[in-house]
UniProtKB/Swiss-Prot annotation:
This is ATP-dependent 6-phosphofructokinase subunit beta. GO terms for biological process: canonical glycolysis; fructose 1,6-bisphosphate metabolic process; fructose 6-phosphate metabolic process. GO terms for cellular component: 6-phosphofructokinase complex; mitochondrion. ATP binds at residues 185, 249-250, 279-282. Transmembrane segments: none annotated. Beta-D-fructose 6-phosphate 2 binds at residues 325-327, 369-371, 426, 460-463.
Amino acid sequence: MTQSLPLLNGTEAYKLVTTQGLYDKTVKFYEKYLQLVHDKRVGTLTNSLITLKLVVDNSFKPLDVVNDKDWRAIVSSALVFSCTNIQHFRDLAAGETIQAYPNETNPIEIYLKDPNGYIIGITETKNAISIKPTLPKQSVEASLISSRSSRIDIASSGVSTDSSYPAIPKTAKAQKSIAVMTSGGDAPGMNANVRAIVRTAIFKGCNAFVVMEGYEGLVKGGPNYIKQVYWETVRNWSCEGGTNIGTARCKEFREREGRLLGALHLIEAGVDALIVCGGDGSLTGADLFRSEWPSLIRELLDQGRINKVQFDRYQHLNICGTVGSIDNDMSTTDATIGAYSALDRICQAIDYIEATANSHSRAFVVEVMGRNCGWLALLAGISTSADYILIPEKPASSREWQDQMCDIISKHRSRGKRTTIVIVAEGAISADLTPISSKDVHKVLVDRLGLDCRITTLGHVQRGGTAVAYDRILATLQGVEAVNAVLESTPDTPSPLIAINENKITRKPLVESVQLTKSVAEAIHSKDFKKAMQLRDSEFVEHLDNFMAINSADHIEPKLPEHTHMKIAIVNVGAPAGGMNSAVYSMATYCMSQGHKPYAIYNGWTGLTRHESVRSLNWKDLLGWQSRGGSEIGTNRHTPEEADIGLIAYYFQKYGFDGIIIVGGFEAFVSLHQLERARENYTAFRIPMVLIPATLSNNVPGTEYSLGSDTALNSLMQYCDIIKQSAASTRGRVFVVDVQGGNSGYLATHAAVAVGAQVSYVPEEGISLEQLTQDIENLTESFSEAEGRGKFGQLILKSTNASKVLTPEVLAEVITQEAEGHFDAKCAIPGHVQQGGLPSPIDRTRGTRFAIRAVGFIESQHKVLAAEANLDDDDFDFDTPKIIATASVLGVKGSDIVFSSIRQLYDFETELNKRTPKTIHWQSTRTIADHLVGRKKL
């Protein structure tokens, strides 16, 4: 590499401030990367064209420039040098954190940090604004690659990938070839996982391959089964169900000879890393493959099927697993790819069945999948408030389960319930391991209770259709993390499994996770059901306890002694959100099972102050609430101070409330703050108070997840899928979709990941004219490349508050004008459709979980305040940590459910003017959303 030009701005001398401790490192840096010669006498670094003067100042602090943002946007200036061979510089900088533009594979500019934090750039262009390299990097023929995607054959020709994709910091030390395969049973979301893996691998400067038809493709090998794929190959895959690269069971791979063939075919294709998306069986096979790899390639060498060069090149195979299974039966992860999509199908079917069951006062036995795992049956039971569930983890004797089921159903019927829903997992067993079939349950319901009963077996409907938003996003984030994992792996690193715990993507040891999963089945078969439950994650056990509590309600003796019984109220504040009714239903039924008396405040705070709209809740009135959308008890945006906080205190005292649960968005957050601050003046507020965040905006401080945001995300996703279909059918059309969310871009960002939107504009970033110009250029490039390749449409998602001037209508007109006839743009306004209809299973089950946690919080904090109840105002210390903690926000943070005091959140963690948290927890998701669609950020 040679520097053929001085600094681009014409400067030939420049001063750099450093410290004595960093002086030597700085010298070595510029000697290595810029080939400058150090003159110790005068402290300069020079060549024939430029001079850098090093100035030592020990008070100087090195610049702290973060790696996950575009350095060009952060620093005020950068030194940029011109060279004739940027590829040589890229190789020289292998192992350093760099940023390359427009992409790492064929960069025109490369930036890296010197030891002092200064940004140094290298470019092949002749001036600062040129986008053409000084010399051509390759012939035209070399840039033509396959691109057309198809379910049957992925290969085609004629499209260049030399497009300008955004760059992300380089992590790989050397280029790898990464293959992805799907194996075992198919699951919705697998295509999104493959798409993310392929595009992230290409970003990282790696070759991307797919293995067709699972392990069968490995065994058969050749270009028909192990195919190199490219950026545009996986276009729109996230919106499609099943797996486009096929999956199959393969007996041959279970034998060593089959694995030997698999190793040979991977080496022939040049693959040195494999990511497997499948269940525990598929992942077990993958890890066995890795452990045998050294002996397999040695055997291939001895047989003469590979040469010594290949043997030395492919010494190690890096393996990573992502879990694709609708059963959600993998230990160490809260959710597997496809599980929530299957749950959505089940809940939708039961919601439909409920209507016909109510008409005829019938009983329905619904059989769902789950051979060794009752997760689907359990969460479907909670989501639809089923009367009884049968799962393999908690069997009873043949007589016991019949008695228990008949007892609870007869109690429900005697109290006026017209419908009966019993959910049976396909692996349901009694304590002696005798299978329990749907027909067995049907017979008991008919013979013992005399019910008009029907059986519905959902079967493969549960696997079908496109993935829900959660699965698309989970699969995408896990795909990105899987590529990072294989690039960071060493021969000594255990094979990782990409998992999720609450809201956090994590890596777990693959072997241990699979072994734990198998241990559950072994424990069940050995009748050690207690161990089987212990091996399930804590969330599963919590869900089961919750189901039993809300299902029994007040039909049995309360769990708590009478002197501990309390009056607990619940109120909805803010805009309606999916899951609000689930929270009210679960809070009320759980209170009944504990012995507490639940109250509902109807129509928010103004309902209380204007009409004294307070009612105690009884079980029969709540029937069906778990699966209803909106807010059955009514809601509005008024805060206590707007409604009359003194009158609210009066009614609290009149009814003797011992605790209050507020369900809602930012208005509910402000309400909790006002009530907590009013404790000094009103003794009625010296009770435990807790907020359950519920808003589609997901903008409540103290939590990364709010009820209603998943329902809204699914509604918006379905709308966008339909709009995108229209855009693709019309050819050459962009739709600008207006997205709600206030000043939070959460909804727009996550919807962009789920539907593969080309651009998303959010309030946190706004819309600059420069970025809009760049985005229009990207769209023009996309449409020009797509010409002649079938249907192709694009989406732009714009948060309403991203710009008040550039409305969707204006944006569409500007884009159409700038497109100059190559394509056009239309606007689409989904409006309040985004609030959703029926709540999603995630919002239903989390609403239940949060509500029961909230009641538990009130039970524990009531003791703290009871000890201070008799103190005078002067003696009551409002500022002690234990008193402050009695008014809290329930939230999900990372992998934990936490309670954070409202005072801490309101005073230190909230942007009050913007109505958002100060910390944006989903910023990294934005980066991924942009780089997976090739968007350049300025």
